[in-house]
Curated annotation (Swiss-Prot):
Species whose genome carries this gene: Dictyostelium discoideum (Social amoeba)
Protein name: Probable serine/threonine-protein kinase fnkE
Membership in a protein family: Belongs to the protein kinase superfamily. STE Ser/Thr protein kinase family.
Per-repeat ranges for FNIP: 108-149, 150-191, 192-233, 255-296, 654-696, 741-783, 1160-1202, 1224-1268
GO molecular function: ATP binding; metal ion binding; protein serine kinase activity; protein serine/threonine kinase activity
Active site annotation, chain numbering: D465 (proton acceptor), D990 (proton acceptor)
Enzyme class: transferase
Tagged with keyword Transferase: yes
Record carries keyword Magnesium: yes
Catalytic activity: L-seryl-[protein] + ATP = O-phospho-L-seryl-[protein] + ADP + H(+); L-threonyl-[protein] + ATP = O-phospho-L-threonyl-[protein] + ADP + H(+)
Gene3D superfamilies documented for this protein: Ribonuclease Inhibitor, Transferase(Phosphotransferase) domain 1
One Pfam family of this chain: Pkinase
Keywords: ATP-binding, Kinase, Magnesium, Metal-binding, Nucleotide-binding, Repeat, Serine/threonine-protein kinase, Transferase
């Protein structure tokens, strides 16, 4: 800890990550002088004290805390969503826990009484609790409940009805109908052994654990929907109909009563009868069973007894003669260790890939003898190494088919080992074959690798360096992969025996290294190989091991099958105990469709893909996830299904109706490929920016009030000719559809707000006025041939994309392209009709300075250093003889790249880019390159005397900044120059003031030139760039995240940063928000602030394009900035502003503390309202509020009558708000999660429905309710702190008044009470 403090004092820009784990000691937050606003997951699992906890009250969402002292009010962060207090066992009092939290109290065993737990808790783990529960003790919203030690009587109503996942593994009290919640789907009653009657178990149960149950079961006792049942102790007679027809997994491990046909349901896929030894005849076992365990069976099997669908078969005790075809043909894995009968070739099917038999009397294999080493082994090739960790390992490997034979080893005179191995002529490292394997071969190789690692582990060996380079593939003489045993594992340099493993493993491949090896936490073992195996499988299928999620786990490629994805996912678990071992992994691959009940687990990962998930949903399982993909899920969902925090949601197979409020308001990207139900108002969250359908094809008049996102992709199915006229206006900016048009498009199909229209299957004529004038970018079909109709395009279009498949030459199309179109993409290529296409590859002629590409120092005079670029310095130099490339040009700019830096870049990068741009007037002319005698690289470009960089000009300016008019004038030239660079097919990727040069052309006009193309990239069709390159202070978010979205818009982000530079702000030391977006100088006009803001958008689709930025800069008016300009007076304190124009950044003075916006109803951009406002009043506002829309300074907030707090107020979490007024007409009981925790005066003057327990924040002292409040009994749920209450009733009902007064008398804390505005005693 002291080192952290000292490091912080040395460097004030110390960065706190989003995930913090402290492993021991005492945590003192007092040394942090920075905000912990980025910390989302905080692991304090070994800390035993807390000091200054308010330092992280607001920002931590996931807290793991080993804390045994009494919790006091305010100790825990207010907005924690998942809280691990697994060691806590002190008494809770109301208000000590956060208002909405997933809670782990594994050690807690103090008495709970009603009201001690927040009503919003939906995940509760009380695995040590064994005190009697009474009805109302547990919150009604509970979905996951773990009471694994509980064994007190339960009565109907004790458990919350919404519970879906229930663990009562110690419970053995009599259950009666209605005791278990009706909605429960997973029930663990491992210890239960009381008689069950029909209707005791709820009908919705799908997973049922009754592992101790041995009472007689009768038809109807088990629910009809059960899919998985554990009856591992059951040994009473089963009759037909006892087990439900839908069951797929049955564990009858102890059962040994005679089975008759139809006793077992035909749909069973996994059947465990490990004690069964009664005669089996054809028709007894289910026809669809795939996994069959009859490991005690030793009666004669005949052909037809076992189902043809069996793939995994355990016959561990079987030793009767096996006739041909007795074992089904589909069996892949067969366990027969007791079998000692004679074998013929037809005994086992050809598909059996894993066969375990006993030692056969005729089995002899002399090939496994160790041959003593000789001094010369001429007939074998020899591998030589200086490393040899343990000879015993190599001795053991001589009996393992998946490793090379060892011939021996000797020490030479230098005491180094010479190890002699088998050499196989037809063996190729897997790393050299990756691009040649098809999908089927990839899976076959993966299965064989798993099998080989299983063999190594069974011999007690841990490899520690599994990767493609250490795996050999064996081929036959025809260069075809051997049918079996074609894998050889090599590279045992780091290996150890299991009995000798230690935590100090060094030198293994970092990209494949398991977390426990990096952490040296003592958890090394066989599971470390499983992690490396997962990384190797990603290698095999073409994945990139450098692409990691927030926890450092490699991302699994999307194109894989569900089985392949799940196999890798079972390998790449942070916790070694959660990984499969090699045997489990091999069995999983062989019997991929076996269903097992999986307990919902805590997932802090921000990126989660559950390809096969289609069962019980537990919200706590999704806490912390920002990216959630469920490929197979197709069940109805409700509002608690997905945790509020998910930003990217993909429901690949989902096709059920969506109601208002079902999906959380945090979602920004929503993909519903299979969805085809009517959309209702509020069914698509307002936070969604990007919405993708594929099969959606309906719209009605009821949907015209929908607010749809800015980017909408309808896919191929949506009939835009039929429904297009009903699409809501004014919200969609980008519209994408693959509909195949039957007639020319009509502009009434397209909303007037759309600026980017993508009709990628439109190949018909374009009629006059058929495309709206709002369109700036247009994409047409891949076989568009009506070129003459392009003249009908509106003049607003500047970007056009289309394709064609006929014999037209692109050059012939020039006459059809309207002059207002500046960017053209044809068949995936950017076309420039104004100039001949630049050279495409570096291999073409480059007019180099020297034919042999050599650099001689004596030929050059270095005049001065111009600067340092990426990977090299740049010098101003003179050629001694005054001739460069045959011309009389003496001055030159030379970039020197050291040999060591040359390894970081490819020569073909900067040289090829410069060569490609040699005819582009906005880059320095390229002369050539050369190497000196030390192999340093020199790149020669034009030098223009008198030229200067933007950064040098900034230094010469007063206060080191340009005036706005100067920035505007220069930026128009800079962006136009950038458009020419992009037209040449190049993205710069490192634009900043240092790399922009101003020079004079022949006409003495200022011309912009870009330099330092060392990090540039050529634009290619369908390219996704993942490289982490550029200057950090100017780097776009998508480049830092390496998410494949980097492209030409990344240069626009750099332009925005450069404008900030020119305005006088040092980006290296500027403040940034949570997404890394730099702050904008406050002295700029609102118009300029908004231009920069639109360059710095996190979402690349929302960012300016080159074309739109040129237009916006050209139209900007520096003076008379906006209607708000007159309100910038620093002396103005109180302001009533009657306007409905969007409020721009900085448009309202920072001294205003009272702000009234009576008619305002626009989105409030975070930061638009001044940070000085304390009193904020609205009347017409009804827009979604983002996290920072309301300044932290606001103490009094009046939301007026229009604001729908149920839909738009989820982020209303300011701790500063003390008084909140809202006239919203609630349709359902208010929830604490909608109200600021800090409110003391709450005025809900149109609230006339019932109150629920814990629905009002505990700090509220003054409460105002509606004018027709009749739910009198619910007033008993008021918090204890309320001392002032005002309500209204109609018609002065005396009876109602007396009832109210009677309840108020029980609330001793209430000292002031009003009905209809009249004070009551």
């Amino acid at each position: 800890m002291q080192k952290i403090k000292e490091g912080y004092r040395r460097r004030h820009d110390y960065i706190i990550p989003k995930f913090i784990s402290f492993q021991s000691g005492y945590l003192d937050f007092s040394f942090y002088q920075v905000s912990l606003k980025n910390v989302k997951y905080l692991d304090l699992s070994s800390y035993y004290q807390l000091h200054a906890p308010r330092r992280f009250r607001k920002i931590v969402e996931y807290l793991n805390l080993s804390y045994g002292q009494l919790l006091t009010l305010g100790t825990l962060p207010k907005y924690v969503m998942s809280l691990d207090l697994s060691s806590y066992n002190q008494l809770f009092t109301p208000g000590r826990l956060p208002i909405r939290v997933s809670l782990d109290l594994s050690s807690y065993n103090q008495l709970f009484t009603p009201g001690r737990l927040p009503d919003t808790v939906d995940y509760l783990k009380l695995s040590s609790y064994n005190q009697l529960f009474t009805p109302g003790t547990l919150p009604n919203h509970m979905v996951y409940l773990n009471l694994s030690s509980y064994n007190q009587p339960l009565t109907p109503g004790t458990l919350p009805n919404k519970v879906k996942y229930l663990v009562l593994s110690s419970y053995n009290q009599l259950l009666t109908p209605g005791t278990l919640p009706n909605n429960v789907k997973y029930v663990d009653l491992s210890s239960y052994n009381k008689l069950l009657t029909p209707e005791t178990l709820p009908n919705k149960v799908k997973y049922l654990v009754l592992s101790s149950y041995d009472q007689l079961l009768t038809p109807g006792t088990l629910p009809n929907n059960v899919k998985c049942v554990d009856l591992s102790s059951y040994d009473k007679l089963l009759t037909p109909g006892t087990l439900p027809n839908n069951v797929k997994y049955v564990d009858l491990s102890s059962y040994n009563k005679l089975l008759t046909p139809r006793t077992l349901p035909n749909n069973v896929e996994c059947l465990v009868l490990s004690s069964y030894n009664q005669l089996l005849t054809p028709g007894i076992l289910p026809n669809y069973v795939k996994y069959l365990d009859i490991s005690s069976y030793n009666q004669l099997l005949t052909p037809g007894t076992l189902s043809n669908n069996v793939e995994y078969l355990d016959l561990s005790s079987y030793n009767q003669v096996l006739a041909p075809k007795t074992i089904p043909n589909n069996v892949k894995c067969l366990d027969c260790p007791s079998y000692k009968q004679s074998l013929i070739s037809e005994t086992f099917p050809n598909r059996v890939g894993d066969l375990e038999l006993s030692d056969h009397p005729k089995h002899v294999n002399d090939n496994w003898e160790i041959i003593k080493p000789q001094k010369n082994i001429s007939e074998n090739k020899v591998y030589y190494t200086t490393k040899h960790k343990n000879a015993k390992i190599i001795d053991v490997l001589n009996i393992c088919k998946c490793s090379l034979k060892l011939y021996g080893y000797v020490k030479d005179r230098n005491n180094e080992f010479n190890i002699y191995f088998e050499y196989i002529d037809k063996a190729i490292p897997l790393s050299r074959l990756l691009e040649k394997l098809n999908k089927k071969e990839q899976f076959i190789v993966a299965t064989e690798i798993i099998k080989s690692i299983k063999s190594i582990h069974e011999m007690g060996i841990i490899h520690f360096d599994i990767k493609c380079q250490n795996i050999l593939i064996l081929y036959d003489e025809n260069e075809k992969m051997l049918p079996t045993d074609f894998i050889k594992i090599i590279g045992f340099d780091h290996s150890t025996l299991d009995s000798e493993v230690n935590s100090n493993i060094i030198g293994v491949t970092e990209t494949h290294m398991a977390p426990e090896i990096k952490l040296k936490n003592g958890k090394l073992g066989y599971k470390s190989d499983i992690w490396s195996l997962g990384c190797t499988l990603i290698e095999i299928v073409g994945g990139n091991l450098k692409l990691l999620d927030i926890n450092g786990i490699p991302l699994i490629p999307d194109h894989l099958s569900n089985l392949f994805k799940n196999t890798i996912q079972h390998c790449l678990q942070i916790n070694p105990n959660a990984r499969f071992n090699a045997n489990e992994l091999y069995n999983y691959v062989i019997k991929d469709s076996i269903m097992e009940p999986i307990e919902p687990i805590y997932l802090p990962n921000q990126c989660t893909n559950l390809p096969l998930f289609n069962e019980v949903i537990v919200p706590s399982g999704f806490f912390g996830i920002k990216y959630l993909e469920l490929q197979a899920y197709n069940q109805p969902i409700d509002s608690i299904f997905i945790f509020n925090g998910v930003e990217y949601l993909i429901l690949q197979s989902f096709n059920h109706p969506l109601g208002p409020g079902i999906l959380p308001e945090s979602i920004k990207y929503l993909k519903l490929p299979s969805f085809n139900h009517p959309l209702k108002e509020g069914s698509i969250p307002r936070s969604v920016i990007h919405l993708v359908f594929n099969k959606f094809n309906q719209f009605s008049l009821d949907e015209i009030n929908l607010i749809l996102p800015k980017f909408l992709d309808f896919g191929d199915a949506f009939d835009i000719e039929k429904y297009g006229i009903l699409i809501p206006e004014d919200s969609i900016l980008t519209l994408r559809t693959g509909f195949t048009f039957n007639q020319p498009i009509n502009q009434r199909y397209i909303p007037s707000s759309v600026t980017d229209l993508q009709l990628y299957n439109y190949n018909l004529k374009i009629l006059p006025h058929s495309i709206p004038r709002s369109i700036i970018m247009l994409t047409l079909g891949s076989n568009f041939t009506h070129f003459e109709s392009l003249s009908n395009l509106p003049s607003s279009i500047i970007n056009l994309t289309f394709g064609f498949k006929n014999n037209f030459k692109i050059a012939e199309l020039k006459k059809y392209i309207p002059s207002h179109i500046t960017s053209i993409n044809i068949n995936g290529k950017i076309v420039n009709f104004k100039k001949s296409s630049p050279l495409n590859t570096f291999n073409q002629s480059t007019d180099n300075i020297l034919n042999n590409n050599e650099h001689f120092k004596e030929d050059w005079e270095i005049i001065s250093t111009l600067g340092s670029g990426n990977f090299g310095k740049v010098f101003k130099a003179r050629k001694i003889n005054g001739i460069i490339n045959g011309s009389k040009v003496s001055l030159c700019a030379i970039k020197k790249i050291e040999k060591k830096d040359k390894l970081k870049i490819k020569l073909s990068t900067e040289v090829e880019i410069l060569n490609k741009l040699k005819d582009n007037e906005h880059s320095m002319k390229y002369y050539g390159y050369g190497y000196d005698e030390d192999d340093n690289l020199f790149i020669y470009t034009e030098y223009i005397e008198g030229s200067t960089s933007i950064s040098d000009l900034i230094k010469k300016k007063p206060n080191n900044r340009f005036e706005e008019e100067e920035i505007k004038s220069l930026m128009i030239k800079i962006v136009k120059a950038l458009s020419k660079i992009h037209e040449s097919g190049v993205i710069h990727r490192d634009i900043k003031s240092d790399h922009i040069i101003l020079a004079q052309d022949k006409n003495n006009e200022t011309i912009v030139k870009f330099i330092d193309f060392g990090l540039s990239k050529q634009i290619e069709k369908n390219s996704k760039y993942y490289s982490f390159v550029g200057t950090d202070s100017h780097m776009a978010p998508e480049v830092k995240l390496q998410n494949g979205k980097a492209g030409s818009k990344s240069d626009i982000f750099c332009i925005g940063c450069t404008m900030i530079e020119m305005a006088g702000l040092n980006l290296c030391h500027s403040e940034r928000d949570d997404k890394g977006i730099p702050s904008i100088p406050t002295h700029l006009s609102n118009s300029f602030k908004n231009i920069i803001q639109n360059c710095l958008k996190f979402d690349t689709n929302a960012r300016h394009s080159v074309e739109s930025l040129i237009i916006t800069l050209s139209n900007i008016q520096i003076e008379g900035d906006s209607v708000f300009e007159k309100y910038l007076s620093p002396n103005l304190k109180k302001l009533e502003l009657k306007t409905n124009e969007p409020i721009l950044l900085g448009s309202i003075g920072n001294e205003i503390n009272y702000l009234s916006l009576p008619i305002y109803n626009q989105m409030i951009t975070p930061g638009a309202l001044p940070p000085s406002v304390q009193y904020l009043l609205f009347n017409k506002l009804n827009q979604y509020l983002e996290c920072d829309s309301i300044p932290e300074s606001v103490k009094y907030l009046d939301l007026g009558n229009e604001f729908d707090i149920e839909k738009n107020g989820i982020n209303l979490s300011n701790e500063s708000i003390l008084v909140l007024r809202c006239g919203f007409n609630f349709t359902q009981p208010v929830s604490q999660r909608l109200l600021p925790y800090s409110v003391t005066d709450l005025q809900l003057y149109n609230y006339n429905i019932n109150l629920k327990r814990n629905s009002i924040p505990t700090l509220v002292t003054s409460l105002t309710l509606g004018s027709n409040f009749t739910n009198i009994e619910s007033l008993s749920f008021l918090p204890e702190n309320v001392n002032s209450l005002a309500i209204g009733i109609k018609d002065e009902d005396e009876k109602l008044t007396k009832e109210i007064e009677k309840i108020i008398q029980t609330k001793k804390s209430i000292t002031s009470f009003k009905i209809n505005g009249i004070q009551r005693n």
